[in-house]
Amino acid sequence: MAEIRLQHLAHSYSKTPSGPEDYAIREMDHIWEQGGAYALLGPSGCGKSTLLNIISGLLSPSQGHVLFDGKAVNDLTPEKRNIAQVFQFPVVYDTMTVFDNLAFPLRNQGLAEAKVHSKVQEIAEVLDLQNLLSKKARNLTADEKQKVSMGRGLVRDDVSAILFDEPLTVIDPYLKWKLRRKLKQIHEQFNITMVYVTHDQLEASTFADKIAVMYGGQIVQFGTPRELFERPSHTFVGYFIGSPGMNLIEVQPQPGGVGFNSTHLPLSDGLQRHIEHGQWKNLKVGIRPEFIHVWDEPFDDAMQARVVHVEDLGTYKIMTLDLDGAPLKVRLAEDKPVPQGTAYISFPAQWLMVYADEFLLDATDSEVQP
């Protein structure tokens, strides 16, 4: 098990990068603590697999350092880093039995056959592979092959971390759920550092204790699933996490707050000072569809919005509204009345986020939160 630390790490596939747009990984510092279950979440092309390959040693970074337990490993080959990597498509030795696949890394280390047999049996039991040990790998299903790939990483006692690169992409949805649960059980049992790469927020939130969200070659937020949902540090996190994603409205500074068209949104004194003293290129407000209050008749200072569309999804409804020219999504509980034609809404102050140049403004801090 290892703490994985990235120091001033950056990577470009270009030999002569001329700007940030030429970098697959923009300069970053990050720590994955020993024994944690982490997810690296983001859309295709954001740099997830590149970062994973740098950690495992399959790729050398253009700059910066990778440290395991405080020791730089940039010059170490993948096998000397003691990293196990499970890829999107299962990698097994088709002509070998499941037993021999699992035993392969142990025999390469020269372990006694009695120890090999004991360890293979232990891992086979954990992964429910006992009845398949004598079966040739070529005859396995996709999920069985992926479990064998995972088992080869778990079978070694000296593995520093296991890296999963979208390992469930080719697995049926029901089996995905079973394997995610199995991975969680394995982590709790072995307490090994695991980093799970995915573009699926459900996979990330059900596996990981903490999620690193990547966008444009950067980790734009690192936190628990709840933190990412309730307080996104970047507009991309707000949009990407949740279904539907966060509502984002471009606004302009106004006395006492911000506004758009004829709508005014009051803000705290701290946020107002931030906005007044900053040189921002753009300002946005964001609020989750779940956090918008809705009434079907005028209520206090509620804003009036036009109901454009209502989608009934069984256990909840999604309303599309037009608020002074800005489209909004609102999530309504199944038992809540649906306004007809006109809705009256409010944005609770604790759930209304303000973003300057796409990053969250925090009234308690003196600068934008990166």
Name each model feature, range by range.
Residues 38-39, 85:
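Short beta-strand immediately N-terminal to the Walker A/P-loop
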Residues 82, 88, 92-236:
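ABC ATPase nucleotide-binding domains
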Residues 255-370:
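Non-catalytic connector elements of ABC transporters
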Residues 56:
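Helix-to-loop junction immediately C-terminal to a conserved catalytic motif
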Residues 41-43:
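The feature captures the beta-strand-to-loop junction immediately N-terminal to the Walker
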Residues 64-72:
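Conserved ABC transporter NBD signature motif
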Residues 1-6, 12-27, 31-34, 75-77:
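A short, flexible loop at the N-terminus of ABC-type nucleotide-binding domains that lies
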Residues 49-52, 148-150:
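ABC ATPase nucleotide-binding domain helices that frame the ATP-binding cleft
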